[in-house]
């Protein structure tokens, strides 16, 4: 239902909603916006968004100058706000600086709840290394470009996963993101793969819980979803290939399911001309 009205916002909070004009006498620094011919609606919340990866191509992620990709992320943040999204939960990527710039009023954008670097196993959905890169601990050359910029981090074993989770929390993550299943945009895994041992996932869960927060996981298939739930994960991302028993488990354990449904016509990876 729509109607004509007036809204008073004080310090980013809605104070008054009225069908009649709202007196502003005595309120300093009032800005009046004429909404004639327009609609005012509550701000939308996107529970799964990538400020950085939604606007940068895979080639950008692997090769582009970091400053260039961050400028694109800032532009996308403003566009997201203008689409009506005032709060987003960022599901992975280097957005700590972007969040700070928005919070300090340097850039326009939604409130961001950041996850930080995607945490992936070797050969997992967040492993963007070239085929000639040796796996750790045999790699002689340190972090890859995507790891240095904070897009993803490779962690194998309980200790490495714990460090990766704690480091994201140190940088300001409001939740931790693990890649516990395969995907369609990664180089070395299949969609149906199960990733990370239960003990590794639980290590991230413990680190998150000690910081008063939780773990969200990228995952599609029942086996991988069930493993994540048994490890203590609170939020399942995607889960498109879920079955009935796994859905019942989600309900019993009161797990959040954030599905991001899409169709073949959504064109998730448009060409430059299409963009």
Q: Predicted segments — roles?
A:
Residues 2-41:
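Histidine-rich, glycine-flanked metal-binding segment
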Residues 7, 12, 37, 45-48, ...:
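Divalent metal-coordination and catalytic microenvironments
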Residues 26-39, 98-106, 160-174, 242-255:
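Short amphipathic alpha-helices and their capping/turn segments at secondary-structure boundaries
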Residues 38-104, 122-131, 199, 231:
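Metal-associated gating/positioning segment near the N- to mid-region
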Residues 58-71, 129, 139-163, 214-216:
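Active-site mouth loops of central-metabolism enzymes
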Residues 65-66, 115, 122, 178-275:
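Active-site core of metal-dependent hydrolases
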Residues 69-79, 156-169, 220-224:
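Short, acidic/polar
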Residues 92-94, 150-166, 229, 234-244:
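Active-site glycine- and acidic-residue-rich loops that bind
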């Amino acid at each position: 239902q729509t109607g004509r009205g007036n809204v008073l916002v004080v310090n980013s909070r809605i104070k008054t909603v009225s069908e009649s004009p709202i007196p502003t006498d005595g309120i300093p620094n009032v800005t009046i916006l004429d909404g004639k011919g327009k609609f005012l609606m509550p701000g939308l919340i996107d529970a799964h968004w990538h400020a950085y990866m939604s606007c940068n191509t895979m080639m950008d992620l692997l090769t582009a100058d970091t400053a260039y990709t961050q400028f694109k992320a800032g532009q996308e943040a403003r566009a997201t706000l203008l689409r009506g999204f005032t709060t987003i939960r960022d599901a992975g990527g280097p957005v700590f600086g972007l969040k700070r710039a928005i919070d300090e009023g340097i850039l326009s954008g939604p409130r961001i709840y950041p996850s930080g670097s995607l945490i992936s196993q070797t050969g997992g959905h967040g492993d963007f290394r070239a085929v000639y890169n040796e796996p750790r601990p045999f790699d002689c050359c340190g972090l890859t470009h995507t790891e240095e910029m904070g897009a993803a981090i490779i962690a194998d074993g309980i200790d490495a996963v714990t460090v990766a989770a704690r480091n994201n929390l140190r940088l300001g993550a409001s939740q931790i993101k693990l890649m516990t299943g395969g995907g369609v945009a990664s180089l070395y895994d299949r969609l149906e793969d199960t990733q990370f041992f239960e003990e590794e996932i639980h290590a991230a869960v413990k680190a998150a819980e000690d910081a008063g927060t939780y773990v969200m996981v990228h995952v599609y298939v029942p086996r991988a979803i069930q493993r994540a739930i048994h490890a203590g994960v609170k939020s399942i991302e995607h889960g498109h290939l879920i079955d009935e028993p796994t859905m019942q488990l989600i309900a019993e354990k009161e797990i959040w399911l954030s599905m991001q449904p899409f169709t073949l016509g959504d064109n998730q990876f448009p060409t430059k001309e299409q963009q």
